[in-house]
Amino acid sequence: MAVPKQKRSRSRTHTKRAKIYRTVSVPISKCPNCGQPKLPHRVCLHCGYYNGKQILEIAE
């Protein structure tokens, strides 16, 4: 059965574990049609445009 050769120090363990809990920043771009912030490669929820085409009908 596999057994570790040496004990892992507390700082090494915490450093490795800290990467699990690190948050990932979400890239936010501006909609070229209305200028509102939106997620990339997704339809704008404010105007309904994606890639210069009307995809969703948004009631104002």
Curated annotation (Swiss-Prot):
Cited InterPro entries: Ribosomal_bL32, Ribosomal_bL32_bact, Ribosomal_zn-bd
Organism taxonomic ancestry: Bacteria, Thermotogati, Thermotogota, Thermotogae, Thermotogales
Molecular function in Gene Ontology: structural constituent of ribosome
Record has Ribonucleoprotein as a keyword: yes
Protein origin, superkingdom: Bacteria
Matches recorded under PANTHER family: 50S RIBOSOMAL PROTEIN L32, LARGE RIBOSOMAL SUBUNIT PROTEIN BL32
Keywords: Ribonucleoprotein, Ribosomal protein
Record GO biological process: translation
Species whose genome carries this gene: Pseudothermotoga lettingae (strain ATCC BAA-301 / DSM 14385 / NBRC 107922 / TMO)
GO CC annotations, alphabetized: large ribosomal subunit
Family label: Belongs to the bacterial ribosomal protein bL32 family.
Protein name listed in UniProt: Large ribosomal subunit protein bL32
